[in-house]
């Protein structure tokens, strides 16, 4: 540390927006939604708007205020699982 004159991190990095660790939210959350057809409709709209993007669904427990499920609902046709 003394050779640099300040606190130095050689291999440290902060995750950035475009490095694949963050997801952009589609519209506002569906608070109180109990209709699966509404969720599927939103997935279809998102897929139509962004055909080359992954679509992830995250479900929350509104009583405990925790995430209870998360899964990829759509993979773009260009994605190859190697």
Swiss-Prot record:
The keyword Chloroplast applies. Belongs to the RuBisCO small chain family. It is found in: Plastid, Chloroplast. RuBisCO catalyzes two reactions: the carboxylation of D-ribulose 1,5-bisphosphate, the primary event in carbon dioxide fixation, as well as the oxidative fragmentation of the pentose substrate. Both reactions occur simultaneously and in competition at the same active site. Although the small subunit is not catalytic it is essential for maximal activity. This is Ribulose bisphosphate carboxylase small subunit, chloroplastic. GO terms for biological process: photorespiration; reductive pentose-phosphate cycle. The basic functional RuBisCO is composed of a large chain homodimer in a 'head-to-tail' conformation. In form I RuBisCO this homodimer is arranged in a barrel-like tetramer with the small subunits forming a tetrameric 'cap' on each end of the 'barrel'. PANTHER family: RIBULOSE BISPHOSPHATE CARBOXYLASE SMALL CHAIN 1, CHLOROPLASTIC (PTHR31262), RIBULOSE BISPHOSPHATE CARBOXYLASE SMALL SUBUNIT 1A, CHLOROPLASTIC-RELATED (PTHR31262:SF10). Gene3D superfamilies: Ribulose bisphosphate carboxylase, small subunit. GO terms for cellular component: chloroplast. Keywords: Calvin cycle, Carbon dioxide fixation, Chloroplast, Photorespiration, Photosynthesis, Plastid. Its main location: plastid. Heterohexadecamer of 8 large and 8 small subunits.
